[in-house]
Amino acid sequence: EGVFSDEHGDCPAGTYVRNPPGTSHAPFSTGGCTIFVKLWQFAAGDNESVRLDTTRAAWQPGLVAGLGVLPLHEHGGISTALVRWAPGTRFHAHTHPGGEEILVLEGTLHDEDGDYRAGSWLRNPRYSRHSPWAGEAGALIYVKVGHLGAEWLPLPRD
């Protein structure tokens, strides 16, 4: 919601911004905005900056009918993407050797352990297994896989 801005420009709702360690910016918002932030969650050697308007980007078909995938970033076996689930779409049982984090942005996602509405955050540990499916309205999720157990960059010292 709203518009996030910095000296590089304005980022309307739906923009994915990735600023790796060593970069800097002066963020602000004139009218206010809601943003999702993960600081210092970068694997060693991962230095790519990304600024992507997801509302205009080309989505790809997913691994099952009813899924659309928009890759956001990939490095060393760690992948971040948006995944759009059509209503009632089911994904087969699968395991995440490197763990998985999900932020439900729209709709409802379900699995054997629960029902996750918009705003829900899931952190599934390494080697977790599930069979997710979308609710009646479908779902849009932000998902990151392969990063739990990765070698992280050290936090900066003041």
Feature roles, as predicted:
Residues 1-6, 87-89, 96-112, 118:
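Glycine- and acidic-residue-biased ligand/ion/polar-headgroup-sensing regions
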Residues 32-77, 157-158:
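A short, N-terminal "cap"/entry segment at the start of jelly-roll beta-barrel domains
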Residues 16-18, 69-71, 80-84, 101, ...:
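Conserved hydrophobic/aromatic beta-strand scaffold that supports enzyme active sites
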Residues 8, 27-29, 82-83, 92-96, ...:
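Short histidine-centered beta-strand/loop micro-motifs
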Residues 10-11, 21-45, 126-152:
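Ligand-binding loop in jelly-roll beta-barrel domains
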